[in-house]
């Protein structure tokens, strides 16, 4: 399975007057109102990930709230670190999560906005693999492709020969199976056919 870890970010202000880029009624901008609003958003974002294809395993989402200092709490990174070794894809949703790019994983940003595109471009500039999906349809298609790649990478082909290098196609003629390993991660094991009779 392709293991996906959703990380749902949110900027929650410490006082109603914080944040020059927001406006509204005081009662809607208090820390309590913002917390309640993000609680609803967090639940809705998790619901978007229900009923994924059977080859996709979605781990419980991580609540990545931070305040106007734009520092992700260490507790968020501790939650990620506890499961990062089994994760194939980090799935940032909602607001960006500062310093998430520290992880050398594939990023698939589920957000239809400029922040997702900007974060993806930033990750790519650091050499990370990163994509943006604007909706569930995009997400399903991309995760399926990443799952196929994972399956191919974990595939081992046994090629039995009479000692000569086998050909792998009529037109393509891939003479060097090492190309398949380097490009796709697929391991090719070549051995004489007589060895299976020992």
Regions found by a protein language model. Give the residues of each.
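An N-terminal assembly and electron-transfer interface module characteristic of large anaerobic redox
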Residues: 1-198
């Amino acid at each position: 399975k392709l293991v996906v870890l959703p990380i749902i970010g949110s900027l929650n202000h410490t006082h109603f007057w914080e944040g020059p880029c927001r406006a509204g009624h005081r009662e809607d901008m208090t820390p309590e109102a913002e917390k309640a609003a993000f609680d609803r958003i967090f639940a809705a974002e998790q619901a978007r990930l229900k009923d994924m294809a059977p080859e996709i395993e979605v781990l419980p989402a991580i609540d990545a709230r931070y305040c106007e200092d734009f520092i992700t709490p260490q507790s968020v990174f501790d939650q990620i670190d506890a499961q990062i070794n089994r994760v194939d894809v980090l799935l940032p949703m909602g607001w960006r999560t500062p310093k998430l790019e520290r992880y050398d994983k594939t990023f698939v940003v589920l957000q239809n906005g400029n922040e997702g595109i900007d974060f993806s471009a930033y990750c790519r500039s650091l050499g990370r693999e990163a994509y943006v999906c604007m909706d569930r349809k995009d997400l399903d298609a991309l995760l399926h492709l990443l799952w196929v790649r994972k399956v191919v990478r974990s595939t081992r082909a046994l090629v039995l020969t009479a000692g000569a290098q086998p050909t792998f196609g009529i037109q393509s003629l891939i003479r060097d199976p090492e190309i398949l390993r380097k490009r796709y991660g697929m391991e090719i094991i070549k051995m004489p056919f007589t060895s299976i009779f020992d």
